[in-house]
UniProtKB/Swiss-Prot annotation:
Organism: Bacillus subtilis (strain 168)
Family: Belongs to the EPSP synthase family. MurA subfamily.
Residues that, per the record, bind phosphoenolpyruvate: 22-23
Gene3D superfamilies named among the record's database cross-references: Enolpyruvate transferase domain
Protein name per UniProt: UDP-N-acetylglucosamine 1-carboxyvinyltransferase 1
Binding sites annotated in the UniProt record for UDP-N-acetyl-alpha-D-glucosamine: 93, 122-126, 306, 328
Compartments, as annotated in UniProt: Cytoplasm
Cellular component per GO, a single term: cytoplasm
Signal sequence extent: none
Modified residue annotations for 2-(S-cysteinyl)pyruvic acid O-phosphothioketal: 117
PANTHER family: UDP-N-ACETYLGLUCOSAMINE 1-CARBOXYVINYLTRANSFERASE
Length: 436
């Protein structure tokens, strides 16, 4: 089993480049199934396990997919299979995003009920409600969701009960080839939604209003391949911004888009962090003393739930009492217990956590409970006394490329090792930590 070992106490300095956005590239690759003519070339694709998984799904469905040099080439002009089995979908719940394109392109989709990360129930009822409104017949049973329509999907007016990102993406893709106009209301406004709409419009689609609460899609008869550049990953950018702040560092986060990070920038500045827009990215300078704040996660443009655990690590360094309220997902405080193992003063009260700081974090062996928690525990390790050993790295690898190497390049004392190949010196250091 692999683990990351962090020896705390180093200030981070330098420049780090942000990868293409994981949460943008997965729906864009899925949307490539809509193109019945020509191949698509998707650029700035991060080399993440989730990307390899969605590529496997498309190959299984009959598309020709190549991935090299951060470019994914997809040719989906062939006859497509319409079933995505559990062996693929269990690895990543975003696999359900092939449902909209398959239904629009072929009139049929059979997709295993999704797996993926363990953050609450994350139901897909909003996806199915939308498909039904467009004329599809839905059956759920034996571990599968099956959707079928005779002829083309029909344009419809659809109101989402919650601005679900996945439902918004799936319904945009389904509506792109539907007959007539589809109006989606109370939709997600994330930058990744805008990126998907731009991609489909480049393929010949007619989508207006992405990034607002209402999106109108005028269906077309066919779409073609196109070359597209993925937007930078705002969550990776935010994670490195927190890394700079927590270590009293000075880091240029190259590729960070200020307009995608408005709420995070506001909250970090409220804590006393200096953030400067330098055109090519954001420079983040951490203060000697951080101020306590309250955060409530909300759908975009509110504070992103995917930055909640990283900010919890930062708030442990703030002088006073802070509160984080999680409104997007239930059961997303599992990392709080891991922070407690590192001497964090955290109390969970329903959907909120109370954080008392500042505390001197202590190195410990901790487990990543989900993707963002893994990054947050490493951030805590950057300022912990002694050694922090983070396990369950499979979660981290779903969302970050070379995370430990990028931190090391900024000055962190960090390495990734196999338990079996851990050096004798590292084992001695671990014993020293435990005896301290």
């Amino acid at each position: 089993m692999e683990k990351i070992i962090v020896r705390g106490g180093q200030k981070l300095n330098g420049t780090v480049k942000v990868e293409g956005a994981k949460n943008a590239v997965l729906p864009v690759i899925a949307a490539s199934l809509l193109a019945s003519e020509e191949k698509s070339v998707i650029c700035d694709v991060p080399t993440l396990s989730d990307v390899y998984t969605i590529n496997e799904v498309l190959r299984h469905l009959g598309a020709d997919v190549h991935f090299e040099n951060n470019e994914v080439t997809v040719n989906a002009s062939y006859a497509l299979q319409t079933e995505a089995p559990f062996e693929y979908v269990r690895k990543m719940r975003a696999s359900v995003l092939v449902m909209g394109p398959l239904l629009a392109r072929t009139g049929h989709a059979r997709v295993a009920l999704p797996g993926g990360c363990a953050i609450g129930s994350r139901p897909i009822d909003q996806h199915l409600k939308g498909f039904e409104a467009m004329g599809a017949e839905i059956k759920v049973g034996n571990g599968f969701i099956e959707a079928e329509v005779k002829g083309r999907l029909q344009g419809a007016k659809i109101y989402l009960d919650f601005p679900s990102v996945g439902a918004t993406e799936n319904l945009i893709m389904a509506a792109a080839l539907a007959e007539g106009t589809t109006t989606l209301e109370n939709v997600a406004k994330e930058p990744e939604i805008v990126d998907l709409a731009n991609y489909i419009n480049g393929m010949g689609g007619k989508i207006r209003g992405a990034g607002t609460g209402t999106i109108k899609i005028e269906g077309v008869e066919k779409l073609h391949g196109v070359k597209h550049h993925i937007i930078p990953d705002r969550i990776e950018a935010g994670t490195f911004m927190v890394a700079a702040a927590i270590t009293e560092g000075n880091v240029l986060v190259k590729g960070a888009v200020p307009e995608h990070l408005t709420s995070l920038i506001a909250k970090m500045e409220e804590m006393g962090v200096t953030i400067k827009d330098e055109g090519e990215g954001l420079r983040v300078i951490g203060p000697k003393e951080l101020k306590p704040i309250d955060i409530k996660t909300m759908p975009h443009p509110g504070f992103p739930t995917d930055m909640q655990s990283q900010m919890m690590a930062l708030l442990l360094r703030a002088s006073g009492t802070s509160m984080i309220t999680e409104t997007v997902f239930e059961n997303r405080f599992m990392h709080a217990e891991e922070f407690r193992r590192m001497n964090g003063d955290i109390k969970i009260e329903g959907r909120s956590v109370i954080i008392n700081g500042p505390v001197q974090l202590q190195g410990a062996e901790v487990a990543a409970t989900d993707l963002r928690a893994g990054a947050a525990l490493i951030l805590a390790g950057l300022v912990a006394e002694g050694h922090t050993r983070v396990t369950e790295l499979k979660h981290l690898d779903r969302g970050y490329v070379d995370f430990h190497q990028k931190l090391a390049a900024l000055g962190a004392d960090i390495e990734r090792v196999n338990d079996e190949s851990a050096s004798e010196q590292e084992n001695k250091e671990v014993v020293s930590d435990l005896n301290a």
